[in-house]
Amino acid sequence: MSKNIVSNFFKHIKLVSKHKWLVFKFSVKLGIPFRGLMHDLSKFSYDEFWESVKYYDGKVSPITKCKQENGYSKAWLHHKGRNKHHVQYWVDLGTKGVAPVIPYKYVVEMICDKLSASITYNGKNWTNSSEYEYWVKEKKRIIVNPKIENFLEEVFLNLKENGLEKILDKKYLKETYKKNCIDDKTEYYYEFKGEWKKVG
């Protein structure tokens, strides 16, 4: 085992631990301590852990690095199917265009996860705008029920304009979720029009 792998091993554990601690702190504040405690435990499974050590970067997710080099990540395929705080968990391309409204506790865990990852990877460069700017790009490449999209959009825009403490508020998130995801009775369907294209 090379020195680089050994170094990455400990750095990855430190990074994941920092991320989990922040998620737990946010989760406790928002009334879902159990979700914070159980958050991302699959990262310590063989399939996820060793790929993450191999592609550890410190500035971006190892999953992102692996995707950049290989076009896909086995760790991500394993992770998204076991963690309900990811929008990808709730998408089944074999269904007739229905993406469910993600339950409240998992969307709140998602917010905690996104905030923690953004703060962890951006470090001193993190600002109230960081997550909103990332979300604007991310929402273009994922499938998520528009009600959840509207909810996240409103929360991250509020973060950008008014700061972290304004959104780390249980009452605010419950009211915003209710407005966007429960009171809105609109039904949505998506059309998947994927097709293979030859490269080279």
Region annotations inferred by a language model:
Residues 1-200:
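Metal-dependent phosphohydrolase cores
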